[in-house]
């Protein structure tokens, strides 16, 4: 809820508190389900196996999600669970599988259109740590566009001009801070 609070207080958004209240979400925990990024670095013996909690809205949702990469586009429509979740990440897979990718993860460009909210456009420039965040931000605004600079090779500056977001959020894991993550493929 901290990002939503800041968007409301500093940027004029009107994100309803119901979208940030955890009581308005279902939670299902999968025990001993994956090895997190630190565990993958140090090994299962040192890092252990983590639980994963899937969080989904209890309230009504209605989305169109556009997934664009490699010159193609896939369109998903329906509620949060049908349009946004990639349920194959909840199936039995190796422990090293990134379970957070269930929140429609690691694509060059995603556009979430929330048909239940009338305003608020966010452009998020992110790495894999943004996966669940853009999904949950999308519950309270009309549009979230998420770009992964590791995969998106066009000019992000031109993309922002063309799509006119109300705010741009840059969300990276601290380990990723470096020159290439701030290049934005801007044309000089």
Predicted region positions:
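Extracellular glycan-modifying ectodomains
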Residues: 1-188
